Amino acid sequence: MESLTLQPINKIQGEVNLPGSKSVSNRALLLSALAKGTTRLTNLLDSDDIRHMLNALTKLGVKYTLSADKTECVVEGLGRPFSVSEPVELFLGNAGTAMRPLAAALCVGQGEYVLTGEPRMKERPIGHLVTALQKAGADIEYLENTNYPPLKIVGTGLKAGTVSIDGSISSQFLTAFLMSAPLAEGEVRIKIEGDLVSKPYIDITLHIMKQFGVEVINNDYQEFVIPAGQHYVAPGDFLVEGDASSASYFLAAAAIKGGEVKVTGIGKNSIQGDIQFADALEKMGAEIEWGDDYVISRVGKLKGIDMDYNHIPDAAMTIATTALFAEGTTAIRNVYNWRVKETDRLSAMATELRKVGAEVEEGEDYIIVKPVPHLKHAAIDTYDDHRMAMCFSLLALSDTPVTINDPKCTSKTFPDYFDKLKALSC
C-alpha cells in the first residue's frame, strides 16, 4: 500500500482557493441534466464522485462538454425525466451524492436501470429512501441485501400525494426525494419521521432547486410541499461554491500553527452549513474573520469544547483531530450518521486517535477526545475515506511526523489536497 509521511510543520501561512463543493456539484449536475435549456457550471469539483455522476449522465443520454481542467461543464438539459430504450447499469463508486439522488430521479423516468457501486456502497443504507419511493408508486427491488444497494429500478413515475420519509439516518434520502418530486404527477407532500439530521444539507438542496426554478414550501423541516406544475429550468450560468468541508482542514491548521490562512471561494453568505465549522473553531479559541467570499483563520490558544455537531457532521471530523492541540477535553456529540458514511467514522476515528496516544471514549453517537502532551508517530489507516486522510494530516502540526496510508483516497473530493497543504507549510 502506498503511504505518505508528513514531517513536522513549523508554521502555516498563505491563501487557498477551494475546489468546488461536492454536495453542490452533484446536485447541480443532476438538475442541469433534467432542466430545460443549457447550464454552464463553473468551479465544478474534479474528483471521483463527480466523475461517477458525469459517467452516469453520459449513459443516460445527457450531452455535456467539459473544459480541459474539468472545472467548467456545459450541460444540455433534457427538459424531461430520463428515458432509455435498453437496460442501463450505472456504477457509482462510493458516491452517496450520486447514488441516492439518481435512485429517486430514475423512478420518474422510463426504462430499466441497475445502480451499483464499490463494496462499501453496498454497506451504506438506502432503505428509508426506497420505502418512501415505493409508497409513491416506484418499482424498485434490492438485488443483494434488503435496504442496501445494488438496486434495480423500472421507471414508472411517482404519484402525487403525501409520503413519509425517515430523516434520522441521512439527509441524502430527503434530498433525493425532494429533487425528484417536481417530476411527479402532481403536488407532493413529504412528512419527516424521526429527527432530521444534517439540516444545512437540506438547505443546500432547496437553494439549488430554487436556482433551477422550483419552489418548495418548508414547514419547519417537519413537512415539505412541492406544488404541482413546476419544471426545472436552466439558470444559464451556475457558480459552484468552494467546498466548505474542505476548508475546515486549512482553517484548523492556521488555528493550530498559524500565521493565518485565507480560504477563498466561500464566505459569510455561503449556502453550505459546514461553513459553521469556523464558528466552532472560534469557540475553541481561534481568531476568525469573515468576508463575502473568504474566511481567514488565525492562530489562537485552543481549548476543548463540548458541542452537538449534528448540523455539520463532515466538518466535525476535523474537530476530532484539532482536539489533540487543545487544552482539555473535547466532546463531539450527536454524530451517529458518521457510522453510515464512507466508513464507520466513529470507530475509525477512535482507533486512529488511540494509535497516536490520545485518550478516547467512543459512544454510539459521540466521541470524546483527551489530548496528550506528546503524540506518537503512527501509520494512520484511512479506510478508503478521504476525510480520514485529510483530518489526520493535521497531526504534522505537532513535533512528530505522521504517516498517512493510501493518501490518494482524497481523490474522492480533493485530489491535490496534500499539494495545497505543502504550499502553506513554512
From Swiss-Prot:
Positions of 3-phosphoshikimate binding: K22, S23, R27, S170, S171, Q172, S198, D314, N337, K341
General function of this protein: Catalyzes the transfer of the enolpyruvyl moiety of phosphoenolpyruvate (PEP) to the 5-hydroxyl of shikimate-3-phosphate (S3P) to produce enolpyruvyl shikimate-3-phosphate and inorganic phosphate.
Subcellular location: Cytoplasm
EC number assigned by the record: 2.5.1.19
Coiled-coil positions: none
Organism of derivation: Vibrio parahaemolyticus serotype O3:K6 (strain RIMD 2210633)
Classification via InterPro entries: Enolpyruvate_Tfrase_dom (IPR001986), Enolpyruvate_Tfrase_sf (IPR036968), EPSP_synthase (IPR006264), EPSP_synthase_CS (IPR023193), RNA3'P_cycl/enolpyr_Trfase_a/b (IPR013792)
Protein name, per record: 3-phosphoshikimate 1-carboxyvinyltransferase
